[in-house]
Amino acid sequence: YDSNSILKEGFDFSDPPMIFECNDMCGCNINSCNNRVVQHGITARTQVYKTYGMGWGVKALVDIPKGGFVCEYVGEIISDAEAEQRENDSYLFDLENRDGDTFCIDANKFGNVTRFINHSCDPNLTPVKVFTAHQDLRFPHIAMFASREIKKGDILGFDYGEKFWVIKHKYFTCWCGLEKCKYSK
């Protein structure tokens, strides 16, 4: 992060690296350390609203700079095996651990504003794995950062990914409406 708590210039939004923030093991000041962004919580103001055709959505109520932290995808952490047993898989976020057990975040019953952010084939948010209190690679925080400048009133969206659409295309298609849409029919 830079001195304004923004991801540094040159951050790779197409293949984001993991971020390890300072924690209680560091000697830094918890209130003034620039490497404690996600753990300070949401600062960008957003609004949940009813969309046309896509249920709920989220829009920005303030300008958000490229690289700015917007929100964290939170919910119940469950194993992939448990996720397979659940009937409603609409709010699952796969944590994609390459080694050992795999888990996901289920925001169906427990979550925040982030669960209402819709898919976009031209996303303005990028999910980034962030570690704050530990370094257990199975359990990252999923932080949403602005992948470009976001203006007040812009609709927030991130790419749900091909794995999501392989499963869901049987039930619905993408409604982003963009010419370069990857997942409509």
Residue ranges of each PLM-predicted region?
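Cys/His-rich Zn2+-coordinating "finger/knuckle" modules used by eukaryotic regulatory proteins
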Residues: Y1-G41, G157, K170-K185
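Short, compositionally biased
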Residues: I78-F93, V166-S184
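C-terminal folded domains that constitute the principal catalytic or ligand-binding module
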Residues: T114, D122-P123, V128-F164
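Intrinsically disordered, low-complexity regions enriched in proline, serine, glycine
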Residues: S3-I6, N31-R36, K59, E72-Y73, ...
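Catalytic cores of histone-lysine modification enzymes
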Residues: S14-M25, N34-H134
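Short interface patches used for recognition in eukaryotic signaling and trafficking proteins
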Residues: S5-F11, G55, D136-A143
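Hydrophobic, well-ordered secondary-structure elements that form the walls
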Residues: I117, G153, C176
